[in-house]
């Protein structure tokens, strides 16, 4: 049984990824550690020498610089990039709210 869900991810050298993660479409820099039960979404960027502690959620578009520690159960939210669409299929923006 595969305990990691990793799809379309750019991994640097010596990256350590623990079990029960969901990583897709993101970039993770050299010597970074990703703990258990972490989700990192598409277009997120994690720098070099970082530690992403367990149960953390890093949403689309988040950019984490080098040498950053993200503590246990940290959640980044994304209220700048809307996920809803208009009737024509285009993305909603501030004027739609």
Regions found by a protein language model. Name each.
Residues 1-10, 19-97:
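Flexible, glycine/small-residue-enriched loop-and-beta-strand segment within the central core
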């Amino acid at each position: 049984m595969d305990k990691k869900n990793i799809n379309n991810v750019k991994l640097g050298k010596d990256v350590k990824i623990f079990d029960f993660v969901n990583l897709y479409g993101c970039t993770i820099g050299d010597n970074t550690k990703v703990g258990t039960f972490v989700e990192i979404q598409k277009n997120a960027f994690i720098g070099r020498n970082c530690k992403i502690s367990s149960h953390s959620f890093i949403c689309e578009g988040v950019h984490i610089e080098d040498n950053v520690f993200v503590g246990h159960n940290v959640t980044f939210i994304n209220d700048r990039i809307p996920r809803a669409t208009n009737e024509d299929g285009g993305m909603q923006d501030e004027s739609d709210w």
